[in-house]
Amino acid sequence: PAFRTACAEPRGALLLLHSDPVRSAPIVGSAASGARLLILCEQNGWCHVRTRTACGWVPKSDIVLFYCRPAL
């Protein structure tokens, strides 16, 4: 599929949010900086991500690779 994460990993890769809490603002409140994220989709440089307690859109540039695995 056309979908790729910031690191060209397959959909469903687990990622870390950037450590800057201001830049992490789209999902601040329920998800701490450094939380493991699941990328649901990507559009125009933004990624729709989900954690255990929150979801939201974050800039692709704010996401750094932590651990990747294929989606189940």
Task: Name each model feature, range by range.
Residues 1-5, 36-38, 50-72:
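Boundary regions of SH3-family modules and the immediately adjacent low-complexity/disordered segments
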Residues 19-42:
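SH3/SH3-like (including bacterial SH3b) beta-barrel domains
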Residues 7-17:
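Short, basic/aromatic beta-hairpin or loop at an interaction surface
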Residues 44-48:
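Short aromatic-glycine-enriched beta-strand elements
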Residues 14-16, 23, 64:
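Active-site/binding-pocket entry motifs
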Residues 2, 8-9, 31, 41:
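Extracellular/periplasmic catalytic domains that process cell-envelope and extracellular macromolecules
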